[in-house]
Amino acid sequence: KNASPDDLKKAYRKAAIKNHPDKGGDPEKFKELAQAYDVLSDPEKREIYDQYGEDALKEGMGGGGGDHDPFDIFQSFFGGGGFGGGGSSRGRRQRRGEDVVHPLKVSLEELYNGTSKKLSLSRNVICSKCNGKGSKSGASMRCASCQGSGMKVSIRQLGPGMIQQMQHPCNDCKGTGEMINDKDRCPLCKGEKVVQEKKVLEVHVEKGMQNGQRITFPGEADEAPDTVTGDIVFVLQQKEHPKFQRKGDDLFYKHTLSLTEALCGFQFVLTHLDGRQLLIKSNPGEVVKPDQFKAINDEGMPMYQRPFMRGKLYIQFLVDFPDSLTPDQCKVIESVLPRSASSQLTDMEIDECEETTMHDVNIEEEMRRKQHQHAQEAYDEDDEGHGGGQRVQCAQQ
């Protein structure tokens, strides 16, 4: 408890050299030494340890060393060269920067044919004037407030034997762990170590790519000192098409026929996603039923990275029936089409039946109306039940 900072440094240096994994030492012992030094060399963490014990440091913020690389602490004493100038077998680990994700809207035509899009983006890059040091001299001071960790720990007493620990970036150094003298700040980046630049990226959307597919530009995200630069990622978002619908490598297309076309034959021109004109026609004597599907091989979407292979094009046929027919039209149709057995009823069978009257109905609206009616009735019944109870209570008073 009474050891001075210099005593701690000497003791750590001696034990760390002895137990370093590159010298055949025990990795776990080396890690424990780093954790102990990290706590004892930080006045704030040491106070927490003295008052509440090791568990208080581990709980919630990993202050017992879990957030600090033992090799980083070792290299703060000996530099990055390791032993004998040969370099450490492990080296200093760099934090990886965050990826930047952008949605990219594309049409179905662009996914079918492939396309390229040039996009202008702003990003942070290491300041070229100070090489990311933030100062003219290249020097910086360790933040006294957070002891260079970039983080502060606050403790709040919740009750007897209960504490809450919170870790937050240091306000003095903005989480960097370093302080730069105002007079020594880099004139270009103002001590921020990075500057903004405009970058134009050309995004290649290949044939057959899917909705939600990611296109990655490695190492093109924001740069930061001692950080492995993250990626810029574009996520494809397919816009809705007025005529075609895509399912995997297949395309679906709806076409409405008149009743005459459905019974007597049809032909029409379908404009595909690449502008080609496809002639679609029925076979002689073929009758198309409502909601019937037909398939055309190799006219679906190109398969990703196999552009000469395609899925299927499915055409769903809808049949538009006339609203009514004249008696003469009915006679003509009956003379051509076979009558169904159910329509050939005798007069005696008809006399024994009750006549009914049918009317047009929008079934979706009808079901919504009934659902609303049932909900209203249930609400009214519940309201009456509560009301009755209140009236009885008033009578007792």
Swiss-Prot record:
InterPro entries the UniProt entry points to: DnaJ_C, DnaJ_domain, DnaJ_domain_CS, DNJA1/2-like, HSP40/DnaJ_pept-bd, HSP_DnaJ_Cys-rich_dom, HSP_DnaJ_Cys-rich_dom_sf, J_dom_sf
Positions bearing Cysteine methyl ester: C394
Coiled coil: none
SUPFAM superfamilies for the chain: Chaperone J-domain, DnaJ/Hsp40 cysteine-rich domain, HSP40/DnaJ peptide-binding domain
Subcellular location per the Swiss-Prot or TrEMBL entry: Membrane
CXXCXGXG motif repeat residue intervals: 127-134, 143-150, 170-177, 186-193
Region (Disordered): 367-397
Major localisation: membrane
Keywords: Chaperone, Lipoprotein, Membrane, Metal-binding, Methylation, Prenylation, Repeat, Zinc, Zinc-finger
GO CC term, one of those recorded: endoplasmic reticulum
Gene3D superfamilies according to UniProt: DnaJ domain, Heat shock protein DnaJ, cysteine-rich domain, Urease metallochaperone UreE, N-terminal domain
Residue ranges of the propeptide: 395-397
Residue intervals of the J domain: 1-52
Lipid attachment locations (S-farnesyl cysteine): C394
Name of this protein: DnaJ protein homolog 1
Gene responsible for this protein: DNAJ1
